[in-house]
A protein has these predicted regions:
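A hydrophobic alpha-helix feature that marks transmembrane segments and, especially
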Residues: 127-130, 377-405, 480-486, 532, ...
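Small-residue-rich transmembrane alpha-helices
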Residues: 124, 128-131, 344, 427-497, ...
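Mid-to-C-terminal secondary-structure elements
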Residues: 194, 210-226, 237-370, 565-751
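Negatively charged linear elements and acidic catalytic determinants
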Residues: 1-107, 504, 874-881
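Membrane-helix entry/capping segments
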Residues: 67-111, 143, 302-305, 329-381, ...
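Alpha-helical transmembrane segments of integral membrane proteins
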Residues: 81-113, 361-364, 393-431, 442-559, ...
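Hydrophobic, regular-secondary-structure patches
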Residues: 136, 145-208, 215, 244-252, ...
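Interfacial "coupling" helices/loops that link adjacent transmembrane helices in transporter permeases
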Residues: 109, 386-428, 773-811, 865-868, ...
Length: 881
């Protein structure tokens, strides 16, 4: 240690000490004096200089230790950590990257805002869709045996179309359990909202009552608070209620063994379950045994022509659903004697999202898998737009960081270090964007719930799995956004950068930016054009002639002809009909035969019960012949009217006068065969949404449970009050309920309107994100071309010409995006339009409107910066040249 040099060692320690931001010069000098004194004492004691200096240094403290100690001494909170020092759980290098990213945000606020705002919007949309997807895909997942439960769907193949019915023939469940080994159990189920539940003066008239086989609670997992799920529905007059219903009628008392009244019959409470979860397609306030339907609706449980229930089966472990469905098809088709009948096994988990069948349960809002997929892709596209903005602006402004990269490389940084630094910076910005995204989501979630008809709660984000997915998406977005800039900047050659030759090869970078802008606006134009085409179709379905006038028609339930006559006594009631109103799900198909019918023709005909007031009430028209008349008693028993579609199926020539033989297959199980004479042909009526083609229909004089009234458009509230008063004179145990016919037709397209609205919002957000990026690029170009603009102004260029010159390049990119996006948008829209039997031709209008709008918005985005640059004084940019 004889060659130890004290001054050199002190100089090195002093330099490290003075780099510490917690120490001022006086404190550093004081520490140095203390170190010298300690060193001299140790040397005087006989220690060699090198060891003495090390011992003194240990006693005084290293430069890294002294800084935090002095920092804490100056703070009232003794545990405070210096802001430049990494938190205890964060590696120092990562903390350095975080600080660099924060400084960059402070230094370039405008560009940081564009990046963070874009990422925040994209992440907010993505997190929203993750919440929605999680909620929609959680339906019916809580049942213990849910993976082996299937709903049976009846498929009927006609000559031109295939119809699917969510019900199955009533005896299907017992038959398949007895004859098909794969079927372990079955349960038939349906709901009714018209029975009501009563106990003395208390009543729940609008309660949804489930009607099921005794196996219902053994097959489906609804936790019991009281009672035995295996025996709860064993007695025909037993009832299982939810805890809310039990609380409503019995308060804190034990409901077991108590009696509730449904219709006029007593039912004994044999079980209490927890309230049905929101994510269940089986929704009810109580459940009663299905056997009562023989009494209430004359259901024939042994008739294969009876279609009254949804039927669920539970398959054995390892059983093939396809093989079981094939066996069930053979069984049902054989019992019915109809080879065009098939049975599909729909997984329980698919019922909520993948059900577009006739006679489906209508007491819950069905979802749409295609809508969910479409909106998820839209959210992902908006996030991609934000990532493209980040890439574009980072590469465009790479000149500002070129020397930093060059110096880092000269001082020993490897390429991987540079890549890691820039990736970390982009990830930090992504997580800052996530924080802002969560604030946006919290504020916007109530608006989205109202728009989509959902009940998504912000608190659902506390779910560990979902939270992990959100963090993973944010991390991936940060890595994606920073990937190209990181590798691009890391590839800089220090010598060329430090010599000022950075802009060599700018043409390649400009081409990349051009491509990314085109991708951005292509996605945006795709959304805009798609929304415009969807809107055009929805306007078409709203204005298309339906064959009837749905305005000012009120539908309610009816008890008798006397009820109809009582309301007709009021002059505000213009017409009345006891019939199945248009817009209601049609009855089960009937077999129809006539002279000359092709034996291979299996076209289903659908019966509709009407009375002579039907034409006047709904303002339908006759194409040929006449309608039913109260003056002719034979019309009630021997006559039918067919629609134009049925007349075409029956062949050329007039069907009036022909004899039709009907074999009924009603939901009550009627199998009677009768012959009628065709007395007229009614003009076609759209009985359902325009997604379905008009079916061959037979109108019979057969009173239904609905009273349809055409009312005077003046004084509607008074008319409704009169109808309620009249109702109460006939019915005392149930409240008066009614529905306007146009509301029922309007509900057919409720989901489509919601999808259009959400897509419209997403299109606006996509446009916002794309324009943010365009504004950033325009600012960069204006900065880069400041001297060129000054020279052009000196040479006589006008401000107007300079604005067009600067804007043209961007507009050309947007025009190219239109050329790419519009064909794709029309193709996607055509696929959606095919779901409608009656649809509009998109035409060129949406393309022109989307193109013009995108070009106009793009021009306005770049024009602001272009005008600023064009109006600048050329002296400011050329004074030093």
């Amino acid at each position: 240690m004889s060659d130890f040099e004290l001054e050199k060692a002190l100089a090195a320690w002093r330099r490290a000490l003075r780099r510490n931001p917690a120490l001022d010069d006086g404190e550093a000098t004081e520490l140095e004096c203390g170190l010298r004194d300690e060193f001299e004492e140790l040397v005087a004691g006989g220690m060699d200089p090198g060891s003495a200096f090390q011992r003194a240094l240990d006693a005084t403290g290293s430069a890294a230790d002294c800084g935090p100690e002095f920092y804490r001494a100056k703070r009232t909170r003794r545990s405070a950590r210096p802001p430049w020092q990494a938190p205890r759980l964060v590696p120092p290098l990562v903390w350095s990257y975080v600080l660099t990213a924060v400084r960059k945000v402070r230094r370039e606020k405008g560009y940081a805002f564009i990046n963070i705002a874009g990422l925040a919007v994209g992440l907010a949309c993505s997190v929203l869709m993750m919440l929605w997807v999680r909620q929609e895909t959680s339906f019916d997942r809580f049942h213990i045996d849910g993976g082996s439960i299937y709903r049976l769907v009846t498929e009927t193949k006609g000559p031109s179309a295939v119809t699917r019915d969510a019900r199955a023939p009533t005896p299907t469940g017992p038959a398949v359990k007895a004859e098909i080994p794969e079927v372990v159990d079955f349960c038939r189920y349906r709901t009714n909202k018209n029975y009501g539940i009563r106990l003395g003066d208390k009543a729940l008239y609008d309660a949804v009552i489930g009607i099921a086989d005794p196996s219902f609670f053994a097959m489906f997992t609804f936790p019991f608070l009281k009672g035995d799920p295996k025996t709860a529905l064993g007695d025909p007059r037993s009832i299982v209620v939810t805890e809310s219903v039990a609380r409503t009628f019995f308060g804190a008392d034990d409901p077991m063994g108590k009696v509730l009244t449904i219709i006029r019959d007593p039912y004994t409470v044999t079980g209490v379950i927890r309230d049905v979860p929101e994510n269940s397609h089986l929704r009810f306030a109580c459940v009663i045994p299905a056997v009562n339907m023989h009494e209430y609706h004359h259901v024939d449980f042994d008739s294969w022509n009876s279609m009254f229930f949804n039927c669920y089966v539970r398959l054995a472990p390892g059983a093939s659903p396809a093989a079981a469905a094939a066996k069930m098809t053979r069984l049902v088709a054989g019992r019915l004697g109809r080879p065009n009948i098939g049975i599909l096994a729909q997984p329980l988990k698919d019922v909520h999202l993948k059900s577009d069948f006739a006679f489906d349960l209508d007491n819950h809002a069905r979802g749409s898998a295609s809508t969910l997929t479409l909106l998820s892709l839209a959210a992902a596209a908006i996030l991609l737009l934000a990532c493209i903005n980040f890439m574009n602006l980072a590469t465009a402004r790479s000149a500002n960081r070129a020397k930093e990269v060059g110096l880092r490389k000269v001082t020993g940084a490897r390429r991987s270090d540079i890549v890691r630094q820039f990736l970390n910076e982009s990830v930090v910005l992504a997580f800052i964007g996530l924080a802002l995204a969560l604030l946006l989501l919290w504020a916007a979630l109530p608006l989205f719930n109202g728009l989509a008809g959902e009940s998504i709660a912000f608190a659902q984000l506390a779910d560990p799995g979902l939270l992990a997915a959100v963090l993973a998406v944010t991390l991936l977005a940060g890595l994606l956004a920073g990937s190209y800039p990181a590798f691009y900047l890391a590839a800089f050659e220090p010598a060329r950068v430090l010599k000022g030759n950075f802009f060599a090869g700018e043409r390649g970078r400009a081409a990349l930016r051009k491509g990314l802008v085109i991708v951005q606006f292509a996605l945006t134009v795709f959304f805009i054009a798609g929304v415009l085409i969807v809107d055009k179709q929805l306007r078409f379905v709203r204005t298309k002639a339906l064959g009837i006038d749905t305005r000012q028609v009120v539908t309610t339930t009816v008890r008798s002809e006397r009820h109809r006559e009582a309301v007709l006594a009021d002059p505000r009631i213009l017409a009345a009909s006891i019939s199945a109103p248009p817009g209601l799900a049609m009855r089960a198909a009937v077999d129809v035969a006539w002279d000359g019918k092709d034996p291979q023709d299996r076209t289903p005909f659908f019966p509709v019960p009407v009375d002579p007031g039907y034409l006047e009430t709904f303002r339908a028209g006759m194409a040929e012949g006449r309608f039913f008349s109260r003056e002719l008693a034979s019309d009630r028993t021997d006559a039918v009217v067919v629609n134009q579609t049925a007349a075409r199926v029956m062949g050329p020539g007039s069907p009036v006068g022909k004899r039709l033989t009907l074999t009924a297959m009603s939901m009550e199980g009627t199998t009677e065969t009768r012959t009628y004479a065709v007395i007229g042909v009614m003009k076609d009526i759209h009985q359902s949404s325009l997604r379905r083609a008009i079916e061959p229909t037979i109108f019979t004089w057969d009173l239904g449970p609905w009273l349809n009234l055409r009312i005077d458009p003046n004084g509607v509230p008074e008319t409704i009050a009169f109808l309620e008063k009249t109702w109460k004179s006939f019915v005392t145990e149930f409240p008066f309920t009614y529905e306007f016919l146009d509301d029922r037709y309007d509900a057919f397209y409720k989901q489509d309107r919601r999808t259009r609205s959400i897509l419209g919002v997403f299109a606006a957000l996509a446009l916002f994100s794309a324009c943010l990026g365009l504004v950033g690029l325009a600012s960069f170009v204006a900065e880069r071309r400041t001297k060129e603009i000054g020279i052009r102004k000196v040479l006589g260029a006008s401000a107007h010409g300079l604005v067009l010159w600067q804007s043209w390049g961007f507009l050309a990119w947007v025009l190219a995006a239109n050329i790419i996006a519009l064909p794709a948008a029309y193709y996607a829209a055509d696929r959606w339009l095919r779901s409608f039997a009656y649809r509009v031709e998109p035409g060129i209008g949406p393309a022109l409107l989307a193109g013009a709008f995108s070009l106009a918005v793009a021009f306005l985005s770049v024009a602001y910066k272009a005008v600023q640059a064009a109006r600048s004084n050329p002296i400011d940019s050329l004074r030093f040249e």
